Design a protein with these regions (language model features):
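Conserved SAM-binding loop
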Residues: 17-21
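A short acidic, Gly/Pro-enriched loop at the edge of an enzyme's catalytic core
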Residues: 39-50
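Mobile active-site "lid"/loop adjacent to the S-adenosyl-L-methionine
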Residues: 45, 54-81
Length: 177
């Protein structure tokens, strides 16, 4: 059995991810499958960590790139349904993680309210002095701990290179608290 599982809606992406895991020696504990999460009824309450990077918009400006258009727009279900599905997949005391647009935060928190606690919000700023375009939300099942807003993670320096903190997370595997 895998230590980590991931699902992709597109078969080609699942295959590519499995090939990458194998090429890097991770095939014994990483597994990627092709399925529609809303039709995937197995494994309820079985994951310690559920990480989600859902489509960002119901009607985002469509990209000319079909892969990006699919990734950015949810057509089958809205964000609330997506989050409720993720919550079902988390085992007791498990964690939920999501990255999404900052303007979706109110909707995300509304779905989490009363279901998950220990909610932590990390605003993501493209550059210092700008407002958050994305947020990372972490929450825990069966927790009543209060909401925490962390310091923002600034992704790029003025010259466009990664900030020290972002580089550590993206390239060195540092953990966001």
């Amino acid at each position: 059995s895998s230590a980590a599982s991931d699902v992709y809606k597109r078969q080609t992406l699942a295959e590519l991810a499995n090939k990458s895991a194998e090429a890097n020696g991770f095939e014994t504990f990483l597994h990627f499958e092709n399925c529609n999460i809303f039709e995937h009824k197995d494994d309820f309450c079985s994951f310690a960590h559920v990480v989600s990077n859902p489509p960002y918009s119901e009607n985002d400006l469509p990209s000319p790139n079909p892969s990006k258009a699919t990734a950015h727009n949810y057509k089958q279900a809205g964000l609330a349904e997506w989050i409720r599905f993720c919550i079902k997949m988390i085992r007791p005391q498990g964690y939920f993680y999501m990255i999404n647009r900052a303007e979706a935060l109110e909707d995300i928190l509304a779905v989490l309210h009363g279901k998950l606690g220990e909610i932590t919000i990390i605003p993501l700023y493209s550059k210092e002095g700008q407002t958050a375009k994305r947020v990372i939300v972490r929450a825990r099942k069966d927790s009543k701990a209060p909401l925490i807003i962390r310091q923002p993670l600034i992704i790029h320096q003025a010259d466009g290179s990664y900030s020290k903190e972002a580089y550590a997370v993206l390239r060195e595997g540092a953990v966001l608290d």
